[in-house]
C-alpha cells in the first residue's frame, strides 16, 4: 500500500501555486493556447529535455538558465506553435516571452521558464503573447490547474493532470502535475510537455536527482509513434511552502517518499499521454523481468512497446506472440532465447523458449475487450525489472498525421 494518497488539484494542489489558461489567438481555432503556472516565492527548479538535436528555442533557453541558477518562479506555456526551427527570431521570442511575463508578475526575467508546443517551423507570434500576458496573470488562480492543462493541448483529446499528498516530517506535502502529448511521442528526455509542482522543502540538487530518476521510469518509457520531438521537456518546481524540515539526505526515508510521490505522478501522466495517443484504441503495458539490471529490462520493454508490428497486431486483436519475441531479441540486451517466456494477459504463449498451445480465439477476445493490454516477458534468472507503455497503431494515426497542417 502506498504511503501517499491521490487527490485532485493538478499543479495547484501544492501550496503557493497559481495557474491559469486563456486564448491569446495563437491557435486559429480560438481555443485556449497560453498557460501560466507560478509561485510568488522562488522554487527549486529541475528540467529534463529532449535529446533531439533540433531543439526548440524554449528548450535551449531553459537548459541554459537552469545551468546557471537553481530556482525559478514561473512557467509560461504556449500551444499551437512549437517555436522550433525558427532561428534567431525564435530565440528572441523565447527570451521576450520570459521578459513580458516577468514584468507582469513583478519577477526578474531569469525567474521565468518558457515552453512551446505545436507546428514546427512557423515563427512564434510574440505580439499575441505580449498582448495577452497581463490578462493571463490576472486569470491565474489557486484552483486554475485545469485551465492550464487545457491551454497546453494540441492534438490531444483530453487534458491530463493528477496529484498526490503525504505526510513528510509531520507536514502535509503535495506533488501535482499536468502534461500534454498525443503524437510525436518517443521521449528521450511528444510533443510531450510535463509540468510538476510540489510544496516540499528539498535541496535543489536532490530535487533534480529525484526528478531525473522519475522521468527515466515514466516519460522515458513511453512511446506512441517512435518520433522524438524537438520540444520534449519536463519542468518541476518545489516551493517549500509545506514548511517540512528541508530534505537534504538522499538516503533518508523522507527523500524516498518524495521520490515515490514524484514517480507516481510522472507514471500516471505518462500513461495518460499514451492512452491519448493519436488514433489509439488501447494502452499496451510491457513488463520485462530477469535481466541483469533494471536499465536492461526497461530497454527491452520500450523496444517491444515501440514495435510497429506489435502495435499493429494489438490493433488487429491478433495474439501474434512471435512479434513480441522478435522485438525483445533486437533490443540490444543479451539474454538466452532458450529461457524466454511470453505471456499476454493471462495467456501463456511461450515458456523456456518453446511455443505453447493456447486458445487463440480467447486471446483475441482478450485483446478486443481490453483498453489495457498486459504483456509479460521473462528473459532469464536476473533481478532486473522494467516497464514500458505504448499504444496500438490504428488507421486513424495515419489520417491524423497525414492531414496535420492541411
From Swiss-Prot:
Q: Which HAMAP family match?
A: ArgJ
Key words of the record: Acyltransferase, Amino-acid biosynthesis, Arginine biosynthesis, Autocatalytic cleavage, Cytoplasm, Multifunctional enzyme, Transferase
Query: Which lineage do the record's taxonomy fields give for this organism?
Result: Bacteria, Bacillati, Cyanobacteriota, Cyanophyceae, Gloeobacterales
Kind of enzyme, top EC level?
transferase
Q: Please give the pathway this protein is involved in.
A: Amino-acid biosynthesis; L-arginine biosynthesis; L-ornithine and N-acetyl-L-glutamate from L-glutamate and N(2)-acetyl-L-ornithine (cyclic): step 1/1; Amino-acid biosynthesis; L-arginine biosynthesis; N(2)-acetyl-L-ornithine from L-glutamate: step 1/4
According to UniProt, the reaction catalysed is: N(2)-acetyl-L-ornithine + L-glutamate = N-acetyl-L-glutamate + L-ornithine; L-glutamate + acetyl-CoA = N-acetyl-L-glutamate + CoA + H(+)
Function, as annotated, reads:
Catalyzes two activities which are involved in the cyclic version of arginine biosynthesis: the synthesis of N-acetylglutamate from glutamate and acetyl-CoA as the acetyl donor, and of ornithine by transacetylation between N(2)-acetylornithine and glutamate.
Q: What is its main location?
A: cytoplasm
Q: Which residues does the annotation list for site: Cleavage? A: 190-191
Gene Ontology BP, a term: L-arginine biosynthetic process
Might you report a single GO cellular component term? Answer: cytoplasm
Is-annotated flag, keyword Zinc-finger? no
EC annotation? 2.3.1.35, 2.3.1.1
Q: What is this protein called?
A: Arginine biosynthesis bifunctional protein ArgJ
Amino acid at each position: 500500500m502506498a504511503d501517499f494518497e491521490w487527490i485532485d488539484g493538478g499543479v495547484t494542489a501544492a501550496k503557493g501555486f497559481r495557474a491559469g489558461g486563456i486564448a491569446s489567438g495563437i491557435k486559429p481555432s480560438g481555443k485556449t493556447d497560453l498557460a501560466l503556472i507560478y509561485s510568488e516565492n522562488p522554487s527549486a527548479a529541475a528540467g529534463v529535455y529532449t535529446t533531439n538535436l533540433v531543439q526548440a528555442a524554449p528548450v535551449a533557453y531553459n537548459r541554459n538558465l537552469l545551468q546557471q541558477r537553481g530556482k525559478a518562479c514561473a512557467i509560461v506555456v504556449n500551444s499551437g506553435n512549437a517555436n522550433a526551427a525558427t532561428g534567431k527570431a525564435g530565440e528572441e521570442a523565447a527570451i521576450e516571452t520570459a521578459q513580458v511575463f516577468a514584468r507582469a508578475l513583478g519577477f526578474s526575467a531569469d525567474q521565468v521558464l518558457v515552453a512551446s508546443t505545436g507546428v514546427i517551423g512557423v515563427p512564434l507570434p510574440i505580439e499575441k503573447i505580449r498582448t495577452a500576458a497581463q490578462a493571463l496573470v490576472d486569470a491565474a488562480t489557486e484552483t486554475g490547474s485545469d485551465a492550464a492543462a487545457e491551454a497546453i493541448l494540441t492534438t490531444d483529446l483530453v487534458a491530463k493532470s493528477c496529484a498526490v499528498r503525504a505526510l513528510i516530517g509531520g507536514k502535509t506535502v503535495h506533488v501535482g502535475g499536468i502534461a500534454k502529448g498525443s503524437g510525436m511521442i518517443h521521449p528521450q528526455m511528444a510533443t510531450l510537455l510535463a509540468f510538476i509542482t510540489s510544496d516540499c522543502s528539498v535541496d535543489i540538487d536532490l530535487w533534480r536527482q529525484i526528478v531525473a530518476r522519475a522521468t527515466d521510469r515514466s516519460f522515458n518509457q513511453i512511446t506512441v509513434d517512435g518520433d522524438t520531438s524537438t520540444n520534449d521537456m519536463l519542468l518541476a518546481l518545489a516551493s517549500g511552502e509545506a514548511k517540512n524540515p528541508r530534505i537534504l539526505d538522499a538516503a533518508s526515508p523522507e527523500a524516498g517518499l518524495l521520490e515515490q510521490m514524484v514517480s507516481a505522478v510522472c507514471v500516471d501522466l505518462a500513461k495518460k499521454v499514451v492512452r491519448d495517443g493519436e488514433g489509439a484504441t488501447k494502452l499496451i503495458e510491457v513488463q520485462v523481468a530477469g535481466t541483469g539490471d533494471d536499465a536492461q529490462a526497461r530497454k527491452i520493454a520500450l523496444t517491444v512497446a515501440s514495435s510497429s508490428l506489435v502495435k499493429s497486431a494489438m490493433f488487429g486483436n491478433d495474439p501474434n506472440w512471435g512479434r513480441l519475441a522478435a522485438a525483445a531479441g533486437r533490443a540490444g540486451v543479451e539474454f538466452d532465447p532458450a529461457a524466454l517466456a511470453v505471456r499476454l494477459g493471462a495467456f501463456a504463449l511461450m515458456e523456456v523458449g518453446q511455443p505453447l498451445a493456447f486458445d487463440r480465439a480467447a486471446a483475441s477476445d482478450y485483446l478486443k475487450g481490453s483498453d489495457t493490454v498486459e504483456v509479460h516477458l521473462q528473459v532469464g534468472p536476473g533481478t532486473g525489472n522494467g516497464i514500458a507503455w505504448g499504444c496500438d497503431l490504428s488507421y486513424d494515426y495515419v489520417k491524423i498525421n497525414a492531414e496535420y497542417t492541411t
